[in-house]
Amino acid sequence: MAVRNVMKYSLGPVLYYWSKETLEDFYQQAAHSSADTIYLGEAVCSKRRATKVGDWLDMAKNLASGGKQVVLSTLALVQASSELNELKRYVDNGDFLIEASDLGVVNLCADRNLPFVAGHALNCYNAVTLRLLQKQGMMRWCMPVELSRDWLVNMLKQCEELGIRDKFEVEVLSYGHLPLAYSARCFTARSEDKPKDECETCCIKYPNGRDMLSQENQQVFVLNGIQTMSGYVYNLGNELKSMDALVDMVRLSPMGTNTFAMIDAFRANENGAAPLVLEAHSDCNGYWKRLAGLELQA
């Protein structure tokens, strides 16, 4: 297994519905952040139309001109031919790598002999599937969010046996509310007693998703359109040493402009010299430790 030399950090796509102006301001600041790679694009719902394909491409060009590697993220749940046609515009952009979160996008990239990033929403749980994706053009794989370090170690051993371990990078989503499930239903609209077809894109009122509490007042989930997300914030900032020789890129999911400072905090603690202060019932790292997802273990 190849040992990494330098850990790279990525800023994942904004998963929430923000206004075009908010996004433009966010990515102007992202251009000056310490992120090596920046993902952007609508990854949740095609009804979020405030920012058009051309707008995303303009922001991508601005980021690339500043030296960032830019990746265009795409929908995790493609439900209509019209959505597929719009995704073709992303795939055919001519400049930027694509993050495929649906096998339809994998096929679009493969048909054009284009490399792609396999997103964490793809159901990829064994080395044979990784080999198939790699043959189709995968150059980076972001592992599913619910899987552990032990599982990753075993997976990469299988990849070594298949002779593909050195043919792609490994990325792990390490900060943010985790997307746990996707549905054709819109839970944010339902929480406001609106049908999905008449949702009025009410998700824009919840810039970090809508909290969902248990009867014991525990924040168990966050609703974000068709996504159900973890209630606690996943934070692997103190687990970076355990990623050595396994992970090439650490992804942080945007939760506002304070995410830029969090990237710096991760970098500062890469060797364990500046541990992050994590709080029970707010932060979690259970999945990485092969525990219940909402657990926090030192």
Residue ranges and their predicted role:
Residues 2-124, 128, 132, 142-298:
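Active-site pocket-lining/capping segments in soluble small-molecule metabolic enzymes
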Residues 135:
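Active-site neighborhood of glycoside hydrolase catalytic domains
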